[in-house]
Amino acid sequence: MDTTFKAAAVQAEPVWMDAAATADKTVTLVAKAAAAGAQLVAFPELWIPGYPGFMLTHNQTETLPFIIKYRKQAIAADGPEIEKIRCAAQEHNIALSFGYSERAGRTLYMSQMLIDADGITKIRRRKLKPTRFERELFGEGDGSDLQVAQTSVGRVGALNCAENLQSLNKFALAAEGEQIHISAWPFTLGSPVLVGDSIGAINQVYAAETGTFVLMSTQVVGPTGIAAFEIEDRYNPNQYLGGGYARIYGPDMQLKSKSLSPTEEGIVYAEIDLSMLEAAKYSLDPTGHYSRPDVFSVSINRQRQPAVSEVIDSNGDEDPRAACEPDEGDREVVISTAIGVLPRYCGHS
């Protein structure tokens, strides 16, 4: 495998609370990145159907109409929006990662998916712990969501937003041999920790600590976002415009890409040379020769944690309550075909 390739990070505005339209925009941006020669492109946290910014601007009672609308736009991990994006990856021969609001049963999750250049899903994960007000809207992931996968460009891992601050998250992915890290964020507004320069520093440190290239992607809030969140008459809308801060950093903490203005939509690119990781790991390998397992050890429970575990009646008798079971849409179903399967709608059975 070639050790050099071109990577891309998206800074763009989703079609707020419209999953189908945002999936279409994703396909357009994937084609644009591929045409520019990129072999891997990263999209922001909750890119589909957009980050729920109304949680920042409205009180709990006022958010309810927005929440109902938002929940209706959450998508399934094997839904048509996902298949459309997988087909785009295959058509343009480009690996990609994107965040989405996943509906599983009646619960939403802050999920990410990594699809390789052949259209095969390599990672399907959920944010381990939603941050602050996000917990009102989204459920939690578990240890099975700390994943690194071998792709056409190298070993890739992904985390959402403040997950990139959690030291043990970083350690877990580094221990799996992560080479390229997808750092997906919302827009850089609403809190001191979400200031662009602060997030940039977080990702620079991630790159140095783990010896990886970091692709940082963010959303942008434009006039359509202001209208979607209905904040024109409540606040000075100018304070919420922008929020873009897409960057690509090397393991030496240096900026490898150009940068865009906070209000600008676009894609930033960088030439990645994985041979740089040899120097990085020579200098500092926190999960290898620079570790002290005799002093510190990390234990990770990677077992999935379903809300309900069923023990089937061993005598095989039919349960008369079966007719009263909820519909499939009312329970979380483990989708065994989500990983490692070619897109259904791209000429494959």
Curated annotation (Swiss-Prot):
Q: Which domain of life is it from?
A: Bacteria
What InterPro entries does this protein map onto?
Answer: C-N_Hydrolase (IPR003010), C-N_Hydrolase_sf (IPR036526), Nitrilase/CN_hydratase_CS (IPR000132), Nitrilases_CHs (IPR044149)
Q: Which GO terms describe its molecular function?
A: nitrilase activity
- In the UniProt entry, which residues are flagged as the active site? E45 (proton acceptor), K127 (proton donor), C161 (nucleophile)
What is catalyzed by this enzyme?
a nitrile + 2 H2O = a carboxylate + NH4(+)
Q: Which Gene3D superfamilies match?
A: Carbon-nitrogen hydrolase
* Disulfide bridge map: none
Q: Which residues form the CN hydrolase domain?
A: 5-274
**Any one GO BP annotation for this protein:** response to herbicide
Keywords assigned by UniProt? Genetically modified food, Herbicide resistance, Hydrolase, Plasmid
Note the Pfam families from the entry: CN_hydrolase (PF00795)
Return the broad EC class.
hydrolase
- What are its E.C. numbers? 3.5.5.1
Subunit details: Homodimer.
Q: Which family does it belong to?
A: Belongs to the carbon-nitrogen hydrolase superfamily. Nitrilase family.
Q: What does this protein do?
A: Specific for the herbicide bromoxynil (3,5-dibromo-4-hydroxybenzonitrile); converts it to its metabolite 3,5-dibromo-4-hydroxybenzoic acid.
Miscellaneous comment in the UniProt entry for this protein: Introduced by genetic manipulation and expressed in bromoxynil-tolerant cotton by Monsanto (Calgene).
Q: Which PANTHER family match?
A: CYANIDE HYDRATASE, NITRILASE
Name under which the protein is recorded: Nitrilase, bromoxynil-specific
- Organism listed in the record: Klebsiella pneumoniae subsp. ozaenae
> What's the encoding gene here?
bxn
